[in-house]
């Protein structure tokens, strides 16, 4: 049974699942910001095909809201959790332990075959969320789903330190290429 010290996911799980169900089958899944792997484990157990592949990007340093967190322990817990839910399956995973900007540059350069679903839950600053979104867009397959977490998050003061402004900017610029499938604490879109 995977171990988690926090639960920032379960309260959004119904909306998350509804969005991912529109991307089925999910053979390839990309997650930006994975912490201890709660959402990644959920995707592996409930949404990823039996031979699916998951890519998780996280620098395991956290943001200003994580000053007191031991990220060496977070990384070890993440690996233990992912390995446990993958145990005995044909599914595969890759962890890219660097900034999302570096990792997404690398994934775009590798000429990836694309992802059926992308979950953006890394840095919470508007600029980083916008960059993650734009850099992920070419990696999302036609008909694929992109989900952002923490759209309404305001634990840190200043709109530039919150995801909403970055998500709104992306939605405005790409409005003719997307269908919004959910808009709440999480936002989900489908690529046309």
Residue ranges and their predicted role:
Residues 2-192:
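S-adenosylmethionine/decaboxylated-SAM
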């Amino acid at each position: 049974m995977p171990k988690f010290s926090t639960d920032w996911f379960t309260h959004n799980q119904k909306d998350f699942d509804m969005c991912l169900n529109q991307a089925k089958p999910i053979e390839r899944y990309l997650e930006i910001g994975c912490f201890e792997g709660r959402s990644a484990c959920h995707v592996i157990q409930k949404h990823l095909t039996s031979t699916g592949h998951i890519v998780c990007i996280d620098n395991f340093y956290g943001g200003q809201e994580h000053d007191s967190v031991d990220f060496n322990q977070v990384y070890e817990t993440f690996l233990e959790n992912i390995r446990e839910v993958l145990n005995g399956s044909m599914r595969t995973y890759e962890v890219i332990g660097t900034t999302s900007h570096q990792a997404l540059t690398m994934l775009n350069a590798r000429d990836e075959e694309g992802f059926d679903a992308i979950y953006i839950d890394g840095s919470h600053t508007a600029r980083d969320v916008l960059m993650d979104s734009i850099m992920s867009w070419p990696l999302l397959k036609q008909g694929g789903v992109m989900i952002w977490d923490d759209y309404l998050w305001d634990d840190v003061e200043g709109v530039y330190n919150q995801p909403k402004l970055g998500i709104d900017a992306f939605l405005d610029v790409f409005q003719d290429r997307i269908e919004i499938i959910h808009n709440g604490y999480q936002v989900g879109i489908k690529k046309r």
